[in-house]
Amino acid sequence: MVKIAVCGAAGRMGGRIIAAVKEAEGVEICGALERPGHPMVGQDAGYNAGLGAIGVAISDDLNAVVQACDVLIDFTAPKVSLKNLEVCALYGKSIVIGSTGFTPEERALAAELARDIPVIIAPNMSVGVNVCFKVLADVAKILGEDFDVEIVESHHRLKKDSPSGTAVRMGEVVAGALGRDYNKVANYHREGICGERTHDEIGMQTVRGGDIVGEHTVYFIGMGERIEITHRAHTRDMFSRGSVRAAKWVVTAKQGVYDMQDVLGLR
């Protein structure tokens, strides 16, 4: 039985992850974390998950929770995730990170901290999105240089980072398949008289509003035709179920940084 702890247990994703752990086989919820001072600290973690009492109180003691678990699932923010990763490394515990918005420097630090433990860092835990990553690479290689690439992503009005980590990863996948450096060809802003579109650029547009769970479309636009590859998330449950699947996988992995492509055997 894999013992799972959840960080951000009082949040939307935290609640869905706890529910996913309770419905999955071979795993159990052994800990729930929140920041010190959060009003739900001390309350049963099952209530936020819509389960009623499950006998696991929300704690603000990171060290104690990590020591008691086999793997920590973290959907918070980069700085919090890095702190959690540091503590997991201290105690030799695995961690699954679904936080987005990491800078290149933060990614490098995460890789350094993962030298002694297995770590999964994935901007999207959905099986469907990760299949899209595979498809996008294949399509980009087939179409080559004859099609322009644009990405549009839409999320709820409360999302804090832009563009989404999933959209950035899609851009990285396409750029890599085309032999381009994503950081050099990504275009996040067009306004006014900005000139013609350059051949290599990958445009990135964001939409924020309402309660959109998540929608990503990659356009391959040629002369006289275009291909659109879209993924739409209807609920957060596929993220939470994917994170539990990742947690079950990572506890048997060797030290290092992995993503959902590794979990799903898509490499």
UniProtKB/Swiss-Prot annotation:
<dbReference type="InterPro" id="IPR000846">
    <property type="entry name" value="DapB_N"/>
</dbReference>
<keyword id="KW-0521">NADP</keyword>
<feature type="binding site">
    <location>
        <begin position="98"/>
        <end position="100"/>
    </location>
    <ligand>
        <name>NAD(+)</name>
    </ligand>
</feature>
<feature type="active site" description="Proton donor">
    <location>
        <position position="159"/>
    </location>
</feature>
<dbReference type="GO" id="GO:0051287">
    <property type="term" value="F:NAD binding"/>
</dbReference>
<keyword id="KW-0560">Oxidoreductase</keyword>
<feature type="binding site">
    <location>
        <begin position="8"/>
        <end position="13"/>
    </location>
    <ligand>
        <name>NAD(+)</name>
    </ligand>
</feature>
<comment type="function">
    <text>Catalyzes the conversion of 4-hydroxy-tetrahydrodipicolinate (HTPA) to tetrahydrodipicolinate.</text>
</comment>
<keyword id="KW-0963">Cytoplasm</keyword>
<dbReference type="InterPro" id="IPR022663">
    <property type="entry name" value="DapB_C"/>
</dbReference>
<dbReference type="GO" id="GO:0019877">
    <property type="term" value="P:diaminopimelate biosynthetic process"/>
</dbReference>
<dbReference type="GO" id="GO:0009089">
    <property type="term" value="P:lysine biosynthetic process via diaminopimelate"/>
</dbReference>
<keyword id="KW-0520">NAD</keyword>
<feature type="binding site">
    <location>
        <position position="156"/>
    </location>
    <ligand>
        <name>(S)-2,3,4,5-tetrahydrodipicolinate</name>
    </ligand>
</feature>
<keyword id="KW-0028">Amino-acid biosynthesis</keyword>
<feature type="binding site">
    <location>
        <begin position="122"/>
        <end position="125"/>
    </location>
    <ligand>
        <name>NAD(+)</name>
    </ligand>
</feature>
<dbReference type="Pfam" id="PF05173">
    <property type="entry name" value="DapB_C"/>
</dbReference>
<feature type="binding site">
    <location>
        <position position="35"/>
    </location>
    <ligand>
        <name>NADP(+)</name>
    </ligand>
</feature>
<comment type="similarity">
    <text>Belongs to the DapB family.</text>
</comment>
<feature type="binding site">
    <location>
        <position position="34"/>
    </location>
    <ligand>
        <name>NAD(+)</name>
    </ligand>
</feature>
<dbReference type="Pfam" id="PF01113">
    <property type="entry name" value="DapB_N"/>
</dbReference>
<dbReference type="GO" id="GO:0005829">
    <property type="term" value="C:cytosol"/>
</dbReference>
<keyword id="KW-0220">Diaminopimelate biosynthesis</keyword>
<dbReference type="GO" id="GO:0016726">
    <property type="term" value="F:oxidoreductase activity, acting on CH or CH2 groups, NAD or NADP as acceptor"/>
</dbReference>
<dbReference type="InterPro" id="IPR036291">
    <property type="entry name" value="NAD(P)-bd_dom_sf"/>
</dbReference>
<dbReference type="GO" id="GO:0008839">
    <property type="term" value="F:4-hydroxy-tetrahydrodipicolinate reductase"/>
</dbReference>
<keyword id="KW-0457">Lysine biosynthesis</keyword>
<protein>
    <recommendedName>
        <fullName>4-hydroxy-tetrahydrodipicolinate reductase</fullName>
        <ecNumber>1.17.1.8</ecNumber>
    </recommendedName>
</protein>
<comment type="pathway">
    <text>Amino-acid biosynthesis; L-lysine biosynthesis via DAP pathway; (S)-tetrahydrodipicolinate from L-aspartate: step 4/4.</text>
</comment>
<dbReference type="GO" id="GO:0050661">
    <property type="term" value="F:NADP binding"/>
</dbReference>
<dbReference type="InterPro" id="IPR023940">
    <property type="entry name" value="DHDPR_bac"/>
</dbReference>
<feature type="binding site">
    <location>
        <begin position="165"/>
        <end position="166"/>
    </location>
    <ligand>
        <name>(S)-2,3,4,5-tetrahydrodipicolinate</name>
    </ligand>
</feature>
<dbReference type="InterPro" id="IPR022664">
    <property type="entry name" value="DapB_N_CS"/>
</dbReference>
<feature type="active site" description="Proton donor/acceptor">
    <location>
        <position position="155"/>
    </location>
</feature>
